[in-house]
Amino acid sequence: MELSTAAKNPRNAKSPKKVVVFDYGFGNVRSAERALARTGADVEITRDFDKAMNADGLLVPGVGAFAACMRGLKEARGDWIIGRRLSGGRPVMGICVGMQILFARGIEHGVETEGLDEWPGAVEPLQAEIVPHMGWNTVDAPADSELFAGLDADARFYFVHSYAVHDWSLDVHNPLLRAPKVTWSTHGKPFVAAVENGALWATQFHPEKSGDAGAQLLTNWIGTL
């Protein structure tokens, strides 16, 4: 059997990308770990500061209440880690509440909690007859999306949430800056389903639970690291 060039010369083989799933107590860390490992990444679940800072990619899952997730994130110094990584252009990806906490604030039961304020906007209760939004749904991604590259327009992703961002208010007027790419979905009223903003990407849905479509999406992210 003929060996590939990389197999003949191991120094030519690419090392797998190191990804840390940040473990701050609020997330499906094991399912995220398994899904990322299937892309070929070297994955570790940890809250270790140095490992989270030095990984090729940092994935921040999130399940539960916005306020509780923010408390857990701050206790684990995750807010500082995310900020430092982004200031250095190091990739970060948020999932579900891990996306929501990237916005300016969350409003639950009339109580407002400050988020990380990477993007303006409020996470509010879904405006729909049936809440939570639980199950499979399509998304409307920009034509030049890197996150959804190779995916059909009718690809479906798995959502479980009662809160969402309904209004995107970040406008970029400087021609030297690239505007974020925003993907939408609809449950009652349209809401933000994903954002691609330089080194910071995020999804409201769970790619780790979204079958082949989710696997392709995670592969796309790993490919940018």
Please annotate each region the language model reported.
Residues W184, K189-E196:
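Short, surface-exposed beta-strand/loop micro-motifs that present aromatic residues
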Residues K14-V20, L200:
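Extreme N-terminal starter segment of soluble prokaryotic enzymes
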